[in-house]
């Protein structure tokens, strides 16, 4: 639902159809998934305290450099925001500096999404490939399978959705919102 809000803001109010929003949300989800995989430790199928199970299965000898730090929640939470934000900034800067608009921007954002899909689905990069990241055990010390944890995650998700809605509403009703509508109407 937060993804839908973001698409509504950029497409409905700015008139910019970006098909890359899913990729940015997936990057954030993968960052949190990497944290959850690091929390499994020796409780995994192969009992390796350092490597996630899929890396043991694929004969990795050491943890890739970009997995370091994901054993700490604060680092993973920072990466959830930072990695997609930096990619969106770089991609947006290049696209808008080149004055790519309309259907061409939509095609380029879809191509970026597909490129990320291919990168994450290859087992060569250490992201789990087609198997993805599975068998999560706990988050912040709470069992992910417990009903209480699931209920708390649901409530937190609802609160995040409500906050995102309020932020989008504040943007739309502000002077910035009028500028966004003017950008859309000028096209």
Pin down the residues of each PLM region.
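Transmembrane alpha-helices and adjacent helix-loop boundaries
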Residues: 1-187
């Amino acid at each position: 639902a937060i993804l839908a809000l973001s698409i509504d803001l950029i497409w409905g109010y700015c008139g910019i159809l970006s098909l890359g929003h899913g990729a940015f949300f997936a990057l954030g989800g993968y960052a949190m998934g990497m944290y959850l995989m690091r929390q499994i430790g020796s409780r995994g199928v192969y009992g390796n305290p350092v490597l996630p199970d899929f890396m043991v299965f694929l004969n990795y000898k050491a943890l890739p450099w970009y997995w370091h730090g994901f054993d700490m929640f604060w680092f993973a939470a920072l990466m959830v925001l930072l990695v997609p934000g930096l990619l969106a900034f770089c991609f947006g800067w290049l696209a808008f500096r080149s004055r790519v608009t309309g259907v061409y921007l939509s095609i380029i954002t879809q191509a970026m999404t597909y490129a990320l899909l291919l990168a994450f689905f290859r087992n060569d990069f250490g992201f789990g490939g087609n198997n993805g990241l599975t068998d999560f055990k706990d988050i912040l010390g709470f069992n992910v399978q417990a009903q209480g944890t699931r209920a708390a995650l649901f409530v937190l998700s609802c609160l995040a959705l409500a906050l995102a809605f309020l932020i989008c509403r504040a943007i739309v009703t502000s002077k910035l919102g009028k500028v966004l509508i003017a950008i859309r109407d000028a096209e």
